[in-house]
Design a protein with these regions (language model features):
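An N-terminal hydrophobic leader/cap segment in hydrolases
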Residues: 23-115
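Membrane-embedded segments
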Residues: 85-192, 216
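Alpha/beta-hydrolase
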Residues: 135, 166, 245-246, 338
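Short beta-strand immediately N-terminal to the catalytic nucleophile in serine-hydrolase-like folds
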Residues: 205-210, 246, 302
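Gly/Ala-rich beta-loop-alpha elbow adjacent to hydrolase catalytic centers
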Residues: 210-214, 218
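Hydrolase active-site cap/lid region
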Residues: 220-291, 345-348
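Short beta-strand/loop motif that positions the catalytic acidic residue
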Residues: 294-296, 300-303, 307
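C-terminal catalytic histidine-bearing segment of alpha/beta-hydrolase fold enzymes
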Residues: 312, 316-319, 324-364
Length: 364
């Protein structure tokens, strides 16, 4: 009931400042219109979950303009069985530091895109270092500054990085995303990687890294990989060597219930029905805790205690639930409030390279 100690004075102040008519209108919107829109508008729900309507101000075709050295822009296309249409997915491939240094002169002198792609593909195919497939969270695109900082961490660790934009994001096909759709996108990029590296007698290890909403997408993929391959691909795929979840949640329903502005409506007697039930259906449920119970892939969870977007308590709850429900490694590394990392800046955490390196070295 503590939120009412804010709500009641707030409306009293509005009444004194704006008068009864305007205050009543605001109250009506607050307690009637907002719940109805939240419950019944699929467009609004999709916007809340994916936030892919936010503009992108960086050049997707030129990774160097975002501060990345030794990177290429490319795309893959496939026929989507989820949306029954052709889908193009935009990607960045960032080379490991050692490979970039070795090829720097050649890359700078190569203007032909096909030749450049051939060089990158060959390096990926014969790689002896890990590959990280990065699944970003909602809003913006693969160009977002905090994402670029993380790619640079991977590059310094001498890993290949593959970063994609799902349908509806960046320069990928502009259609409405759904949980099944973005999971299909991640699967197709993972399949593209495996197609290249599985030609080798000893392919490099592949790890999937998800952040925020990307943890729900990557967990859905890894937890149901065999089923997804059977329904969406014409071949099985091996599991990745590990799954790294940055700022994960248990289910989208619990994330909405614990979101930082949710207390403004939790006092409403119909809160659960109007605000939570829309996120129980398959359209966008992201039941990470259920998906992860189906796989024994090693998992590393990273979460900052001062995260107000996805509260630390949800990451900790996920860790405990998964640890009880399955075998295999499940690790949790928390970052103290004093570090001020919040929801997006674990990429700048002191010692992050060692945390990642230790996990990947242990699970190759």
């Amino acid at each position: 009931m503590h939120i009412l100690s804010f709500i009641v004075p707030f409306y009293i102040i509005l009444y004194l400042l704006l008068g009864a008519s305007i205050t009543a209108t605001i109250f009506f919107i607050h307690v009637i219109i907002v719940p109805l829109v939240f419950k019944y508008s699929k467009t609004f729900q999709r916007g809340i979950v994916f936030s892919n309507f936010l503009p992108v101000f960086r050049d997707l075709e030129d990774p160097a303009s975002s501060g990345l050295d030794g990177a290429r822009n490319l795309s893959i296309e496939f026929q989507s069985k989820v949306d029954n249409c052709r889908i193009k997915i935009g990607l960045w491939h960032i080379l490991p530091k050692s490979v970039n240094e070795r090829l720097k002169t050649m890359l700078q002198s190569t203007a032909d895109k096909e030749e450049l792609n051939s060089i990158f593909d060959e390096e990926l195919a014969k790689s002896k270092t890990p590959i990280v497939l990065y699944a970003h969270g909602n809003a913006l695109a693969r160009t977002a500054p905090h994402r670029v900082l993380l790619y640079q961490v991977f590059q310094k660790l001498d890993y290949h990085t593959i970063a994609l934009d799902y349908r509806g994001y960046g320069d990928s096909t502009n259609i409405n995303p759904s949980e099944d759709g973005v999971v299909e996108d991640l699967l197709m990029v993972y399949n593209w990687i495996r197609t290249i590296i599985d030609k080798s007698d000893s392919p490099p290890p592949v790890y999937i890294w998800g952040h925020s909403l990307g943890t729900g997408i990557s967990s859905h993929l890894v937890g149901n990989l065999d089923t997804l391959c059977a329904s969406l691909l014409d071949r099985p795929l091996p599991q990745p060597q590990g799954l790294i979840l940055e700022a994960p949640f248990t289910t989208l329903e619990e994330e909405v219930a614990n979101y930082c502005v949710t207390p403004l409506v939790t006092w409403l007697p119909y809160f659960n029905y109007f605000f939570l039930t829309p996120f129980v259906t398959r359209r966008h449920a992201f039941k990470t805790v259920t998906h992860l119970a189906r796989t024994t892939v090693p998992i590393l969870i990273l979460h900052a205690r001062d995260d107000i977007i996805v509260p630390y308590a949800l990451g900790e709850k996920l860790y405990k639930s998964v640890k009880q429900s399955r075998g295999g490694t499940v690790l949790l590394h928390s970052f103290d409030r004093s570090e001020g990392l919040g929801h997006k800046m674990i990429c700048a955490a002191e010692g992050l390279d060692k945390i990642i390196g230790d996990f990947i070295t242990e699970h190759q």
